[in-house]
Amino acid sequence: ATKSAKPTYAFRTFXAVLLLAINFLVAAY
């Protein structure tokens, strides 16, 4: 039950990093 909150936080963090990486690649391109 303690791990119910971790997946969403990790997923949002991953997504946020992924979006930043995409924006950086698009800006660099």
Swiss-Prot record:
The keyword Amino-acid biosynthesis does not apply. GO terms for cellular component: photosystem I. InterPro entries: PSI_PsaX, PSI_PsaX_sf. Keywords: Photosynthesis, Photosystem I. One of its GO terms (biological process) is photosynthesis. Belongs to the PsaX family. This is Photosystem I 4.8 kDa protein. It comes from Thermostichus vulcanus (Synechococcus vulcanus). The gene is psaX.
